[in-house]
């Protein structure tokens, strides 16, 4: 008889399936991701720290997992939910199965459940707390635990680097503030010749200025931006002194530093096919997204920020630019991985902004 596993939700519902991955059972906020591919990059994205991911695509793991495509050295999510997990993947780059990697990193999961039903529940009711148990007799106690437990709202401290390190390049010097960065951000900067110094999330503005970088990148990361107060103060300190570009959580922190506010979304944006409109050009780009918080558009009225991009599906803010200083941000992931590369050009715009600022500084000092 096959062993059973149960996914239990705080609203009192539960789903019966089969165990995959680790037997180290956990709980967390359950969310859904609509991407059809890129499950390796998804489970290793630090922005999912503490969450349980429901994959809406029905077959996960069919091309295996390799050592090169991780977005972080160690995945930090709390679980996965799939309709079916492939045990016999086929791909020339495959080194391990999805199940083996979940076991290696102590990530529990469940398969054989109705992921469409779970996704509809989250879409209609909002994200929920959820947990796993292998004993049906424990379901009631798990529901009570979920209804009373407070989940962490600031996971940045968990995933940020503890000390600075360098990813060497031959050109511009960029400081990347690590709130839970994806490795492909570093790859994209290195591909443009940037010498990247990755620093902890709580690095002060004074410390960054002493490094004399040409630019600063504010990375993605997990959790509630309102909880990362130290970064808001740092951004205030570098604005106007060093050009910077914010992505995802970095975008939200940029907005908060200028007096805007954020809010928790009902079910967030998580997937690789979210359409975003550039308000300047009118062009639509398909983007990779992973966020459960957004910036309140009304709160931008009395700031020096202008909205540059909006989400087509729900009209939420997807991009900002300072009206007079060299700083901009996007809510989505231009580095993709997984997802389309429609917005990869934003890294080039960042480089152009740095060079324009350097030229202006040279002219002013001449």
From Swiss-Prot:
Catalytic residues identified in the record? 248 (nucleophile), 333, 335
Query: What InterPro entries would the database entry show?
Result: Anth_synth/Amidotransfase, CarbamoylP_synth_ssu, CarbamoylP_synth_ssu_N, CarbP_synth_ssu_N_sf, Class_I_gatase-like, CPSase_GATase1, GATASE
Q: Which GO terms describe its molecular function?
A: ATP binding; carbamoyl-phosphate synthase (glutamine-hydrolyzing) activity; glutaminase activity
- Locate the transmembrane regions by residue number: none
Domain Glutamine amidotransferase type-1 positions = 173-360
Q: Which UniProt keywords apply?
A: Amino-acid biosynthesis, Arginine biosynthesis, ATP-binding, Glutamine amidotransferase, Ligase, Nucleotide-binding, Pyrimidine biosynthesis
Q: Identify the stretch(es) annotated as CPSase.
A: 1-170
Q: What does the entry give for GO biological process?
A: 'de novo' pyrimidine nucleobase biosynthetic process; 'de novo' UMP biosynthetic process; glutamine metabolic process; L-arginine biosynthetic process
Q: What class of enzyme is it?
A: ligase
Task: Determine the domain of life of the protein's source.
Answer: Bacteria
Under Pfam families, the record lists: CPSase_sm_chain, GATase
Q: Which PROSITE patterns match?
A: GATASE_TYPE_1
The UniProt entry, under SUPFAM superfamilies, shows: Carbamoyl phosphate synthetase, small subunit N-terminal domain, Class I glutamine amidotransferase-like
Q: Where does L-glutamine bind?
A: 47, 221, 223, 249, 252, 290, 292-293
So what does this thing catalyse?
hydrogencarbonate + L-glutamine + 2 ATP + H2O = carbamoyl phosphate + L-glutamate + 2 ADP + phosphate + 2 H(+)
Pathway participation: Amino-acid biosynthesis; L-arginine biosynthesis; carbamoyl phosphate from bicarbonate: step 1/1; Pyrimidine metabolism; UMP biosynthesis via de novo pathway; (S)-dihydroorotate from bicarbonate: step 1/3
Q: List the EC numbers from the record.
A: 6.3.5.5
Sequence similarity: Belongs to the CarA family.
**SUBUNIT field:** Composed of two chains; the small (or glutamine) chain promotes the hydrolysis of glutamine to ammonia, which is used by the large (or ammonia) chain to synthesize carbamoyl phosphate. Tetramer of heterodimers (alpha,beta)4.
As for what it does, the entry says:
Small subunit of the glutamine-dependent carbamoyl phosphate synthetase (CPSase). CPSase catalyzes the formation of carbamoyl phosphate from the ammonia moiety of glutamine, carbonate, and phosphate donated by ATP, constituting the first step of 2 biosynthetic pathways, one leading to arginine and/or urea and the other to pyrimidine nucleotides. The small subunit (glutamine amidotransferase) binds and cleaves glutamine to supply the large subunit with the substrate ammonia.
Protein name according to UniProt: Carbamoyl phosphate synthase small chain
Q: Report the source organism.
A: Staphylococcus saprophyticus subsp. saprophyticus (strain ATCC 15305 / DSM 20229 / NCIMB 8711 / NCTC 7292 / S-41)
């Amino acid at each position: 008889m096959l062993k059973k596993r149960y996914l239990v939700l705080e609203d009192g519902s539960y789903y019966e399936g089969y165990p995959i991955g680790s037997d180290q059972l956990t709980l967390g906020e359950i969310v859904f991701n609509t991407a059809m591919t890129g499950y390796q990059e998804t489970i290793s994205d630090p922005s999912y720290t503490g969450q349980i991911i429901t994959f809406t695509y029905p077959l996960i793991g069919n091309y295996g997992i390799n050592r090169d495509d991780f977005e972080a050295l160690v995945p930090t999510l709390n679980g996965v939910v799939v309709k079916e997990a492939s045990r016999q993947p086929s791909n020339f780059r495959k080194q391990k199965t999805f199940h083996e990697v979940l076991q290696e990193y102590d990530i529990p999961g469940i398969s054989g459940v109705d992921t469409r039903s779970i996704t509809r529940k989250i879409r209609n009711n909002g994200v929920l707390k959820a947990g796993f148990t292998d004993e049906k007799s424990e379901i009631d106690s798990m529901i009570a635990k979920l209804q009373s437990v407070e989940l962490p709202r600031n996971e940045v401290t968990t995933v940020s680097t503890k000390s600075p390190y360098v990813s060497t390049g031959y050109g511009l010097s960029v400081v990347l503030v690590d709130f839970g960065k994806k490795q492909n951000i570093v790859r994209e900067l290195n591909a443009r010749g940037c010498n990247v110094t990755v620093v902890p999330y709580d690095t002060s503005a004074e410390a960054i200025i002493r490094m004399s970088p040409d630019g600063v990148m504010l990375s993605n990361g997990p959790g509630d931006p309102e909880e990362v107060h130290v970064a808001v103060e740092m951004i205030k300190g570098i604005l106007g002194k060093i050009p910077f570009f914010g992505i995802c959580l970095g975008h939200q922190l940029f907005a908060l530093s200028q007096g805007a506010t954020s809010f928790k979304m009902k079910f967030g944006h998580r997937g690789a096919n979210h359409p975003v409109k550039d308000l300047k050009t009118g062009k639509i780009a398909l983007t990779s997204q992973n966020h459960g918080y957004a910036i309140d558009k009304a709160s931008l009225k009395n700031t020096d920020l202008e909205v540059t991009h909006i989400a087509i599906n729900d009209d939420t803010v997807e991009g900002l630019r300072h009206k007079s200083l060299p700083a901009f941000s996007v809510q989505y992931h231009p580095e993709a991985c997984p997802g389309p590369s429609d917005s990869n050009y934003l890294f080039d715009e960042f480089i152009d902004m740095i060079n324009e600022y350097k030229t202006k500084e040279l002219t002013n000092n001449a």
